């Protein structure tokens, strides 16, 4: 018997005893023998170990031979050969080896392993002190808290922007409702599985615990990142091929038990006041995970109070995610994506720890935190998962219950920003049927307010944050199509060349606090015609900055993989160049350079030879049908003047195109004020040029040429205003005469 095994069995027995006393199994003995000869039979790696009911052996004692009982009724003796006629004898309670937990442990230990194989196993896995040499400890104080306090939104609105208040229909307040709630269980996902963790692992004993799994499969079954979350710790599994994956285990780890000869200290890479990080990776895999040797690996996740959820999201996850997105590393497994996955798992872990604080939290703050958790989950799926994704969505029943109650209780959500987050939570938790039409109507009105605010200015960080959430709503719901179509056209109209140019300039800045800073409406809009080739054609004399490819890469990553939530657009091939415009409740337009979709088409004739532009009008109630053939066509009428009476030109799109380059800009005009703004020569939206033309795509399905249009602003509305003003003047004059007479 090789040296060290007796000590190992003693340690094993102590572990078994402690687990038996603390587990739900308890200590128990088998009441009946397995057969007539043996008391216990264990299968260890397919080789049975039999414990005899009765057996004797001879040993030398004071120069005399005597028999010694090896197996007794209440104990099992282990005799280990030391030298000729010398044994180490250990007596252990039989009940330690007779219960289900004992079988679970012993079946994971190969007691028949040869010395050569044992020595090979010693050199298989990397040890931190020997192979990584990058151990670090952090001494910061850890406390569950929220550094944003009661701030209702992560990014606050500009001081000069008035946030609309929410109007709610009269409802009955549920009994027992209070304005503030404890954080207990609020951000804790539902642990819907009982997992056998580390089953069959070379180094670890398996453990049974409530948990949840979330996998992100990049290309195939061999390349993935998997998150396993338990009550006390989480595991990040990184697989690059079919070999043993790397494990990052973080948290409170007394239940993570190592097999001999390894000990926990051999694998501790990072250590904080309350938690440890273990890394288990084979030596021959270190070349693929060389970042484990970097002394600053995971510093941005662990060198502050990471139990502060808001600080964790800002300082850690968003920092890593921004780096991944800007560098185009989505769908790759390297240091950046591994750190991002770890920060995501740490956010889930910290969110579940919020209940430890036992503090009260307002409804708007709770909604913002929960929406932030769901938003980073959505980004993880977008960035890492293949298409279509196979990732299991996490469920938050307590947060959903809070959202439902707040939705039907007056005065609980007063600002539109809180309503946006509430609806976002319900939509991402498969609760679309609970979202009322009045809620989405107000969100669409908020989108229109942002549209008007930024007609002549670049988007603020706050606007990008809100449009990010609303853009996701558009593509994740099937209900309330009218309101979703309105939000969709707002995002499409905001995706201009000016916005794309400004967005590329933003990417040149080295620091971005949140992912929403890198959001552009182009990501959620109907514009699918931006490409590096097209931008190069539009600006042939300009040097394309390095941030332009990064911007287009971000668009490619963040854009939805389908338009299936819109029945009249779902069949559009997203790999082709087009613009989809949902200008009104019933009418959509698709702008392409070839016939692509069935409908009423308006071919544009004022383009050079070799260039084509086709505008196809579809009905929102008609199922999308792909076609490459010419179909029903109408001619485009030139309009010489526009009247604003009856708002006939409201809910339309102004399309700017070039004879040689095709579509340049698209602007959404919701009401008469937008039309006046667009056609006012002082705003330089419509600029006279021999090669540039302007079309207006109307809500009634008509397309007009408006390059030389004149706006008739003397409509009945302005006339009535003049009449009212004149009447007021006359009234004041008559009142003056009466007072003077008196």
Curated annotation (Swiss-Prot):
Post-translational modifications: N-glycosylated, O-glycosylated, and sialylated.
Subunit text: Interacts with glycoprotein L (gL); this interaction is necessary for the correct processing and cell surface expression of gH. The heterodimer gH/gL seems to interact with gB trimers during fusion. Forms the envelope pentamer complex (PC) composed of gH, gL, UL128, UL130, and UL131A. The pentamer interacts with host NRP2. Forms the envelope trimer complex composed of gH, gL, and gO. The trimer interacts with host PDGFRA. The trimer also interacts with host EPHA2.
| Pfam families xref list | Herpes_glycoH_C, Herpes_glycop_H
Q: Which organism is this protein's natural source?
A: Human cytomegalovirus (strain Towne)
What ranges does the Virion surface topological domain annotation cover? 30-719
**Chain ranges passing through the membrane:** 720-740
> Where is the signal peptide, in residue numbers?
1-29
Its membrane topology is listed as: Single-pass type I membrane protein
Q: Where in the cell is it found?
A: Virion membrane; Host cell membrane; Host endosome membrane
Glycoprotein as a keyword of this entry, yes or no, is yes
Q: What is this protein called?
A: Envelope glycoprotein H
Instruction: Describe the task this protein carries out.
Output: The heterodimer glycoprotein H-glycoprotein L is required for the fusion of viral and plasma membranes leading to virus entry into the host cell. Following initial binding to host receptor, membrane fusion is mediated by the fusion machinery composed of gB and the heterodimer gH/gL. May also be involved in the fusion between the virion envelope and the outer nuclear membrane during virion morphogenesis. In human cytomegalovirus, forms two distincts complexes to mediate viral entry, a trimer and a pentamer at the surface of the virion envelope.
Query: In the UniProt record, which residues carry a glycan?
Result: 55, 62, 67, 192, 641, 700
Q: Which GO terms describe its biological process?
A: entry receptor-mediated virion attachment to host cell; fusion of virus membrane with host plasma membrane; symbiont entry into host cell
Q: Which HAMAP family match?
A: HSV_GH (MF_04033)
Gene Ontology cellular component annotations, sorted alphabetically: host cell endosome membrane; host cell plasma membrane; membrane; viral envelope; virion membrane
């Amino acid at each position: 018997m090789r040296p060290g095994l007796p000590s190992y069995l003693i340690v094993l027995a102590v572990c078994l005893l402690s687990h038996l006393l603390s587990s739900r199994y308890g200590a128990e003995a088998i009441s009946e023998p397995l057969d007539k000869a043996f008391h216990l039979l264990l299968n260890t790696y397919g080789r049975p170990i039999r414990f005899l009911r009765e057996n004797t052996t001879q040993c030398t004692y004071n120069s005399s031979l005597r028999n010694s009982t090896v197996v007794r009724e209440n104990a099992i003796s282990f005799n280990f050969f030391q030298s000729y006629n010398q044994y180490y004898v250990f007596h252990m309670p039989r009940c330690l080896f007779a219960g289900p937990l004992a079988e679970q442990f012993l079946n994971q230990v190969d007691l028949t392993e040869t010395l050569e194989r044992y020595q090979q196993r010693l050199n298989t896995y990397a040890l931190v002190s020997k192979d990584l040499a990058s151990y670090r400890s952090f001494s910061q104080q850890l406390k569950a808290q929220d550094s944003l306090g009661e701030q209702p939104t992560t990014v606050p609105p500009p001081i000069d922007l008035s946030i609309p208040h929410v109007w709610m229909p009269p409802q009955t307040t549920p009994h027992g409702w209070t304005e503030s709630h404890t954080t207990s269980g609020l951000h804790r996902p539902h642990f819907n599985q009982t997992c056998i963790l580390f089953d069959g692992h070379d180094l670890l004993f398996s453990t049974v615990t409530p948990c949840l799994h979330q996998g992100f499969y990049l290309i195939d079954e061999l390349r993935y990142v998997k998150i396993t979350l338990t009550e006390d710790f989480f595991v990040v599994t990184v697989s690059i091929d079919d070999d043993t994956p790397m494990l990052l285990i973080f948290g409170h780890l007394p239940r993570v038990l190592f097999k001999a000869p390894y000990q926990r200290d051999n694998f501790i890479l990072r250590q904080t006041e309350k938690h440890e990080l273990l890394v288990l990776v084979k030596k021959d895999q270190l070349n693929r995970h060389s970042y484990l040797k970097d002394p600053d690996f995971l510093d941005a996740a662990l060198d502050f109070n990471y139990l502060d959820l808001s600080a964790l999201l800002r300082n850690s996850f968003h920092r890593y995610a921004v780096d991944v997105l800007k560098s185009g590393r989505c769908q790759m497994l390297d240091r950046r994506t591994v750190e991002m996955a770890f920060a995501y798992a740490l956010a889930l872990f910290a969110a579940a720890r919020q209940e430890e604080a036992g503090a009260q939290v307002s409804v708007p703050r709770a909604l913002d935190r929960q929406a932030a958790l769901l938003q980073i989950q959505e980004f993880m799926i977008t960035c890492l998962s293949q298409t279509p994704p196979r990732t299991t969505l996490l469920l938050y029943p307590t947060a959903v219950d809070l959202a439902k109650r707040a939705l039907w209780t007056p005065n609980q959500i007063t600002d539109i920003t809180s309503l946006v987050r509430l609806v976002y939570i319900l939509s991402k938790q498969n609760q679309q049927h609970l979202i009322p039409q009045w809620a989405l109507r107000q969100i669409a009105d908020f989108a229109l307010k942002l549209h008007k605010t930024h007609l002549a200015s670049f988007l603020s960080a706050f606007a990008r944050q809100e449009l990010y959430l609303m853009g996701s709503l558009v593509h994740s719901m099937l209900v309330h199509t009218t309101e979703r179509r309105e939000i969709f056209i707002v995002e499409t109209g905001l995706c201009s060349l000016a916005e794309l140019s400004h967005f590329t300039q933003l990417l040149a800045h080295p620091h971005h606090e949140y992912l929403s800073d890198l959001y552009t409406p182009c990501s959620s809009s109907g514009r699918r015609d931006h490409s590096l080739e097209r931008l190069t054609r539009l600006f042939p004399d300009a040097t394309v900055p390095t941030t332009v490819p990064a911007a287009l890469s971000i668009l490619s990553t963040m854009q939805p993989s389908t338009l299936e939530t819109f029945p009249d657009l779902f069949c559009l091939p997203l790999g082709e160049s087009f613009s989809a415009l949902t200008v009104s409740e019933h009418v959509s337009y698709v702008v392409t350079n070839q016939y692509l979709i069935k409908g009423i088409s308006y071919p544009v004739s004022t383009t050079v030879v070799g260039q084509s532009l086709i505008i196809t009008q579809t009905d929102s109630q008609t199922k999308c049908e792909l076609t490459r053939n010419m179909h029903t066509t109408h001619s485009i009428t030139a309009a010489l003047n526009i009247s604003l009476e009856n708002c006939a030109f409201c809910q339309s799109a102004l399309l700017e195109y070039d004879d040689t380059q095709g579509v340049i800009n698209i602007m959404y005009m919701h009401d008469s004020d937008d039309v006046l703004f667009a056609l006012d020569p002082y705003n330089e939206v419509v600029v006279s040029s021999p090669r540039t033309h302007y079309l207006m795509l109307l809500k009634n399905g008509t397309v007009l040429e408006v390059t030389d249009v004149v706006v008739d602003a003397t409509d009945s509305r302005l006339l009535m205003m003049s009449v009212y003003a004149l009447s007021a003047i006359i009234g004041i004059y008559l009142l003056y005469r009466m007072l003077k007479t008196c």
